[in-house]
Curated annotation (Swiss-Prot):
Positions of modified residues (N5-methylglutamine): 153
Annotated source species: Shewanella loihica (strain ATCC BAA-1088 / PV-4)
Name of the protein: Large ribosomal subunit protein uL3
Record PTM: Methylated by PrmB.
Alphabetical list of Pfam families matching this protein: Ribosomal_L3 (PF00297)
GO MF annotation: an example: rRNA binding
Ranges in a coiled coil: none
Listed GO biological process terms: translation
Amino acid sequence: MAIGLIGRKVGMTRIFTEDGASIPVTVIEIAANRVAQVKTLETDGYRALQITTGTKKANRITKPEAGHFAKAGVEAGRGLWEMRLADGEGEGIEVGAELNVDIFADVAKVDVTGQSKGKGFQGGIKRWNFRTQDATHGNSLAHRANGSIGQNQTPGRVFKGKKMSGHMGAERVTTQNLDVVRVDAERNLLLVKGAVPGATNGDLIIKPAVKA
C-alpha cells in the first residue's frame, strides 16, 4: 500500500505536446493534507495515517471533532480520511505533518477513487444498457420494459442480484492506471490523463497505481 492524498476535482481541459498532439486531462487540486492521527499496531492493531484537508466553518464542527483536531494541533478540515500503511511505510511522519502534491513528482501512474455522479431512479435501459422492445408490431405499453425477470414454478422466485430498475450512480468508483501528465507543486495541482469519477468539486483519493 502506498500513501495517497485527498484532492478536489477542478474540471477537465486539454494540453498540447511539443508535436501538437492534444491530451485530455483532469485537473485535481491537492491542498496540504494534514495528519490528524497516526495509528499504530500497539494502540490500534494496524498502521494507518488519518488525514484531513481543506477548511470547515466553525459552527459546522462538532465538539468531538473540535477536540480531536485540537489534540492533533491541526486546523479542522472538511472531512477525515484514513490511509493504511504497509510495514516500513510512513516512518517519520508525525501528527501535524503536512503532505503535499510533490509526493507524486516521481510517480508515473495513479489510481483515483471518488463518488460517481448520482442519476437517481433509472430503468433497465439506462442503468444496465438493456435493449428496447419492439416499437410497433403490436407493442403498446412495453417499449422500455425490462421484460422477463425469471421463471414460473421452478425456481418460483427472482434471483438475488437480478439486473432491474433502481438507484443508479452515487457509488464509490476507482479508475486505475491514469497517467500523471503534470505535477504543479506551486499551485497544488495534479494533472492526470483522462476522466476521473464524480462531479466537479467532488473529493478524490489519489494513490500510486497498484498495477503500474
